[in-house]
């Protein structure tokens, strides 16, 4: 599984071409994962996630309220 990790506010975690920051963010939540900064979305994106990982989903987006 893969997807956008969420911060405490339910929003995607922002980045600006900083893959190492995103890798740390992903591995803090899911130890075996990897991550990078998705340039077009300016958000961290995680890969190698467990199937039950909770990631940002546009249909259940609670960001900003």
From Swiss-Prot:
Record comment regarding domains: Has the structural arrangement of an alpha-helix connected to antiparallel beta-sheets by disulfide bonds (CS-alpha/beta).
Family named by the database record: Belongs to the long (4 C-C) scorpion toxin superfamily. Sodium channel inhibitor family. Beta subfamily.
Secreted found in the keyword field: yes
Protein name from the UniProt record: Putative beta-neurotoxin RjAa8
Expression across tissues: Expressed by the venom gland.
Subcellular location: Secreted
Secreted in keyword set: yes
Keywords: Disulfide bond, Ion channel impairing toxin, Neurotoxin, Secreted, Toxin, Voltage-gated sodium channel impairing toxin
Assigned GO CC terms: extracellular region
Taxonomic source organism: Rhopalurus junceus
Residue ranges occupied by any LCN-type CS-alpha/beta domain in the UniProt entry: 1-64
Disulfide bond positions: 11-63, 15-37, 22-44, 26-46
Molecular-function GO terms, alphabetical: sodium channel inhibitor activity; toxin activity
Principal subcellular localization: secreted
Function, as annotated: Beta toxins bind voltage-independently at site-4 of sodium channels (Nav) and shift the voltage of activation toward more negative potentials thereby affecting sodium channel activation and promoting spontaneous and repetitive firing.
GO process annotations (BP): defense response
Pfam families named in the record: Toxin_3 (PF00537)
CDD domains: neurotoxins_LC_scorpion (cd23106)
């Amino acid at each position: 599984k893969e997807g956008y990790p969420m911060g405490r506010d339910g929003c995607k975690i922002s980045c600006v071409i900083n893959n190492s920051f995103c890798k740390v963010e992903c591995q803090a939540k899911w130890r075996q994962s990897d991550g990078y900064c998705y340039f077009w979305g300016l958000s961290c994106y995680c890969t190698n996630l467990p199937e039950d990982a909770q990631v940002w989903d546009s249909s259940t987006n609670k960001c900003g309220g």
